[in-house]
Amino acid sequence: MIFRISNFENDIVISNEYVRVLEIEDKALFINIVQGINSLCYNQDSEEYILLLDGDKELDLAKDSYFIFDVLNINFNDRKILNKLYSSIKSKVYLDDDIRQELESHYINIFNLIDSVLLELPFEFTYKPEVVVEDLLKLYGIKIINEGQSFMEKILYLVDLISLLDLCKVLIFCNIKSF
């Protein structure tokens, strides 16, 4: 993979075999690059021309990278992480027929119960006739616990989490060498 930034003469080659460190001494350039990467990782426009390439294919930074701006306050319950976690749980639920059938049975019972209550009210209602597993997980408030971890444990936990959930192809830390 290649990281191409307009203000740089050379491309940055990214490999699974080693960690790449990019040091930018010029503060104005540093700010522009960080803002550009951050914007692109959150599907916003950037003033900087920054590309992530896999061979000849241009990758979407918002989908294929994860940018950590503040390493001291890593949010393990970021929407991107939780959506991937919910998707992973959903896959496991649908792979096990017994769990899937039991869950569907509970859905039917809950809908019947809510229907009986709604019929007693003098209003007309509309609602989703089906609840997907992700909706149930969000309703249940499933979150990742990471309290009481040291700085290094949080970093390693994040790397493990990204690897297990196959969250992204490139993990980008800002100013991690400062710690």
What positions do the PLM features span?
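Conserved P-loop NTPase "ATPase switch" module shared by AAA+ and STAND
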Residues: 24, 162-179
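Glycine-rich P-loop/Walker A and Walker A-like loops and their local beta1-loop-alpha1 context
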Residues: 1-94
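Short acidic, S/G/P-rich loop/turn micro-motifs used as interaction or catalytic elements
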Residues: 27-30, 143-149, 175-179
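Conserved P-loop NTPase mechanochemical-coupling segment
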Residues: 102-152
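A general structural signal for short secondary-structure boundary/capping elements
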Residues: 67-72, 100-103, 117
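GG-anchored amphipathic helix commonly corresponding to the ABC/SMC/Rad50 NBD signature/C-loop
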Residues: 151-167
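Extended, H/D-rich, highly charged conserved domains that either
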Residues: 82-91, 96-115
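Short secondary-structure junctions and interdomain/linker hinges
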Residues: 44, 92, 96, 114-117, ...
